[in-house]
Amino acid sequence: MWKLLPAAGPAGGEPYRLLTGVEYVVGRKNCAILIENDQSISRNHAVLTANFSVTNLSQTDEIPVLTLKDNSKYGTFVNEEKMQNGFSRTLKSGDGITFGVFGSKFRIEYEPLVACSSCLDVSGKTALNQAILQLGGFTVNNWTEECTHLVMVSVKVTIKTICALICGRPIVKPEYFTEFLKAVESKKQPPQIESFYPPLDEPSIGSKNVDLSGRQERKQIFKGKTFIFLNAKQHKKLSSAVVFGGGEARLITEENEEEHNFFLAPGTCVVDTGITNSQTLIPDCQKKWIQSIMDMLQRQGLRPIPEAEIGLAVIFMTTKNYCDPQGHPSTGLKTTTPGPSLSQGVSVDEKLMPSAPVNTTTYVADTESEQADTWDLSERPKEIKVSKMEQKFRMLSQDAPTVKESCKTSSNNNSMVSNTLAKMRIPNYQLSPTKLPSINKSKDRASQQQQTNSIRNYFQPSTKKRERDEENQEMSSCKSARIETSCSLLEQTQPATPSLWKNKEQHLSENEPVDTNSDNNLFTDTDLKSIVKNSASKSHAAEKLRSNKKREMDDVAIEDEVLEQLFKDTKPELEIDVKVQKQEEDVNVRKRPRMDIETNDTFSDEAVPESSKISQENEIGKKRELKEDSLWSAKEISNNDKLQDDSEMLPKKLLLTEFRSLVIKNSTSRNPSGINDDYGQLKNFKKFKKVTYPGAGKLPHIIGGSDLIAHHARKNTELEEWLRQEMEVQNQHAKEESLADDLFRYNPYLKRRR
């Protein structure tokens, strides 16, 4: 801002502040700069104008250009040098100007005005820029040593606030410059800056009495201290505040790493990077290096300095409670603050050890990631021995819902067979963290837990279908648990199980460690396919029979649903093509499809027990019954087909009935002889025709359109004039006749009053 200060002579009084874009006339009457007691001053002696010569108003090294134009009679002198009349000259700060010859001397000075705004909205910045521009100043976004004011609506602990306090610059509201501009335009005293201090809005400080005025103590607040920054972003943000406060700021990285004694030197403050904060993006290698430095400081009884302590040390003008590595951390601090603000949150977080990451998702082998009810806070081994898996599977089978004692042994054998089958096909297990029911709980609670676990594990939403190898593939514990549970539930739904299945189970349970490459395997793939076919057909038949009866208990219904889903899941995994054959039984009509049961089982020449022979005979009897039923159903189907073929034939001779209206018709409207009644052997032929109605052949004659002519009521002026004249003539004759009658009327019989 340019100012014209009176130095000596008649021109005394207050200085004149010059706004940009305004012409100030110097004279003795009716002008902006008035010099009265000098006879050598002309009425329009000279003109002062201040304007910006650059378009970029953010360049603080450029100031408005002040020009002086002489229009006087006795002359104007700049630094005792007379100007030419009618010419302009550029003035500099400190130049002396003399108007006239009687010693009216002035001095030109430029007062810098560079305002830095913080936490202002768009409208506030626009109004501030306009006011500062008229006052001849600049507005900048980043704090520098040239800044003279910090403009804020409310004081928050930011980097700009810290730098302004250290440099001793005032913090004012935006309204200060608006009022200042009004005072200059009205030639009044500028407003008091103390009345425009913004309020303190910082939760970490609270209602403490804080002096935010320019204090000399803050200029050397960090003298003798060296702040070590381990992050380049922090160094760029906070180094200027440390340097303004008389301290030294250094950036230490892995490339230029110093010795450990450097970090332990007195007066050295290591700034906390806040690696525990999830918002800071730091590479893992750099995190390890930073963590090693933090551990070294802890071993020596030192602590890192949070970012917020730098700002609080400047505000309270002390480094005893703040920025002291050997002192205790003060309450109400936060280790790091995102962005330029140092006060966007207030919480105590001084622990340097990174907390264990909380994984809210657990990954099950060969499945998609899903939400789990528990947190996985520790690493678990990926491979576990087969013996441990067997124990867990047996525990699951023991905790299953209670069945009759006769079925318990078969369910245990089924679990053994499923385990050995998993061993033959899958050499390695991948254990995933799943929920196991407790053994010590009651049986009812265990059954509910297993049902809920089976539903959660088996009815999972999957977005992808993965291709699986036929031979070399890994099976998770969930899949093996599915096989075991399916076999156990099969035993529950099958009261009469073939003894061949039990014999094979017992034989395999005795010889569990079976090699996949051995040629003497008793449990081959063909056996597995045939057995699972029989079990699947029987299980589905049992389910259909249950659906016809009344609903039993809720637990049995849940088991049936789980069993049905298990068979759907085990089909692609074990590569077994189960052909489900449905059997429907009704009271009146029995219809069964043809069933071809072929068992190509190859067994060894070992002795078969009597129980197995009896079961084989029962199966042969069942096959015969099924064949007879299939023949009976085939006969019924053939008879039904014949009836359907006969019913498809339509009647040939029909009586055609027509409904006629009682209206006289033209002879040409309808020709009944033209109707063809002989349609041959056509099926579904339309043997009717729409009945005509009167007027169907042609449109009725409607009066309209061109038949109608619009009637326009035109006035005949000649006829009207003639009629008017005739009326006037008749009226005139009537008047004349009435006058004549009055003259010659004589009434001899007068009525006299008595």
UniProtKB/Swiss-Prot annotation:
Crosslinked positions (Glycyl lysine isopeptide (Lys-Gly) (interchain with G-Cter in ubiquitin)): K435, K686, K690, K735
Effect in UniProt of substituting Q583K: No loss of interaction with KPNA2
Positions of the UniProt region annotated as Mediates interaction with SP100: 111-328
Outcome of substituting S432D: Mimics phosphorylation; impaired interaction with TERF2
Record note on what altering K683R does: Does not affect ubiquitination by PELI1
One Gene Ontology molecular-function label: histone binding
FHA domain sequence ranges: 24-83
Post-translational modification: Phosphorylated by ATM in response of ionizing radiation, and such phosphorylation is responsible intra-S phase checkpoint control and telomere maintenance. Phosphorylated at Ser-432 by CDK2 in S/G2 phases abolishes interaction with TERF2, enabling DCLRE1B/Apollo recruitment to telomeres. Phosphorylation at Ser-432 in response to dysfunctional telomeres promotes non-homologous end joining repair at telomeres, while dephosphorylation by PPP1CA promotes microhomology-mediated end-joining (MMEJ) repair.
PROSITE patterns according to UniProt: FHA_DOMAIN
Effect of V271R: Abolished recruitment to DNA damage sites
Span list, region Interaction with MTOR, MAPKAP1 and RICTOR: 221-402
Residue(s) carrying N6-lactoyllysine: K388
Chain intervals with Polar residues compositional bias: 328-346, 430-440, 447-462
Induction: Up-regulated by ionizing radiation (IR).
Full protein name: Nibrin
